[in-house]
């Protein structure tokens, strides 16, 4: 693996669009927003984004009805088995 195959960044993901959804779907949709945002900014498919449980806990901390307006994640992009993969964890 060369140095160009690895990239790590701290990304702030805005989640305010989750408030446009019904109350019962907000945290679920917020998790989808995180995955879509990272896939777009790291140029990979959504299926290649792996979220750590700390991201899930941060989004669901206030319950299903009230996700945070934004969340900061530390994401790393690297190549595994010839496929680009993004792994993300919560950045405090």
Curated annotation (Swiss-Prot):
Organism, scientific name: Halorubrum lacusprofundi (strain ATCC 49239 / DSM 5036 / JCM 8891 / ACAM 34)
Entry keyword set: Ribonucleoprotein, Ribosomal protein
Molecular function terms, GO-annotated: structural constituent of ribosome
GO biological process assignments: translation
Lineage: Archaea, Methanobacteriati, Methanobacteriota, Stenosarchaea group, Halobacteria
Domain of life: Archaea
CDD domains linked: Ribosomal_L31e (cd00463)
Family of this protein: Belongs to the eukaryotic ribosomal protein eL31 family.
Protein name per UniProt: Large ribosomal subunit protein eL31
Keyword Ribosomal protein attributed: yes
Any GO CC annotation of this UniProt entry: ribosome
InterPro entries in the record: Ribosomal_eL31, Ribosomal_eL31_dom_sf
Pfam families, per the entry: Ribosomal_L31e
